[in-house]
Amino acid sequence: MRLLPPTLTAFYATEKLLEHSHVCEELSVVLFVHPWDMHMWDGRLQKFWMPWLVGMPSETAQAICSVLMGNILVLFPKLRFCFAHGGGSYPIIRGRVSHGWNVRPDLCAQECQVAPNKLDGLLWTDSLVHDAAALELLISTVGKEHIVLGTDYPFPLGELEVGKVVEEYKPFSSKDRENLLWDNAVKMLGIDGNTLFDKNF
């Protein structure tokens, strides 16, 4: 059953989506957001695998901006969204989005009176960013406590060695690595970590 569009590029406070968000928050559901409508660019992404390389990160950034400026996280602060691919291109445009919200509130602050960058700490993402510099930027955006291991399995844009970027990120302590590789996901899902070691799980 499809409850949401493939990406949340139009996630505004409509009656239907408010009801849906309320139910998801009540049930402690985690909403994993993965892009797919990345072919609708008037043919400009036809070559060089660009729907996947450029279109997907852009779609994810649009979804995040819709959630932030659509007032969803203000109305439902316990609602957990986890965005694929390290939040797409959102971390690099985060400052631009916040600046736009400040200088054009007539366009950007119609639904939400809280600056987007004040809500970043409520976002979750996976770790699939492919290099250390991108991971560092992501950490500065959502916090290392809100990043879970991403694999993109079985698709070719996943890491060839799952978790390698996390494992090799030098600023991390061993506890940080443990958190990103599995413990953060346990906390995000709200489950007892001990059940993972239960053979009947």
Predicted regions, residues:
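Mid-to-C-terminal alpha-helical segments outside catalytic/metal-binding sites
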Residues: 71, 79, 89, 124-125, ...
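Aromatic-anchored helix/helix-loop segment that forms the rim or "lid"
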Residues: 62, 105-136
